[in-house]
Regions:
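Glycine-rich phosphate/diphosphate-binding loop of Rossmann-like nucleotide-binding domains
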Residues: 1-14
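Short glycine-rich or small-residue beta-strand-to-loop segments that form or flank ligand, phosphate
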Residues: 6-8, 34-36, 57, 85-88
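Thiamine diphosphate
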Residues: 7-10, 20, 25
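Short, ordered loop/turn segments at secondary-structure junctions
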Residues: 10-12, 39-40, 61-64, 89-92
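C-terminal binding/interaction regions
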Residues: 6, 67-126
Length: 126
């Protein structure tokens, strides 16, 4: 949709300090929503959410023998007080995470709102 974003590759298991630093600094960098994608134990979305108050959307990835079901359960079963929004598994989930992020940011950002509304209008008409 042409919305400004950044991409970071972080691991909650291999680089937990980097995840904590990124998550804690996100708000001061102007980041309004974090999309965290993870497979297997899928600790990344919950770890990010533990370190920031901005919305976190988790995307379970089909990286294991059970094709992402483990990641889905790990993301949706967060303890009270540390919420993570969760979308579907894999590519469709990743796409819906971006659309959900746009719908979260849109009410405060006219440019994002216009892009997202245009996208939705195009879906209805085509």
């Amino acid at each position: 949709m042409g919305i400004e974003h950044e991409l970071n590759i972080l691991s909650a298991h291999r680089k937990p300090q980097a995840v904590a630093e990124y998550s804690q600094q996100a708000k001061s960098k102007g980041i309004e929503v974090i999309i965290a994608m993870a497979g297997g134990a899928a600790a990344l979305p919950g770890t990010v959410a533990a370190w920031t108050e901005i919305p976190v959307i988790g995307v379970p990835l089909p990286t294991s023998e059970v094709k992402g079901i483990d990641a889905l359960y790990a993301i949706v079963q967060m303890p009270p007080g540390i919420p993570v929004g969760c979308v579907g598994i894999g590519e469709w989930g990743a796409r819906n995470a971006a659309y959900l992020a746009a719908s979260i940011v849109g009410p405060q950002d006219e440019g994002v709102r216009d892009l997202y509304e245009s996208y939705r209008k195009n879906l209805r008409e085509n």
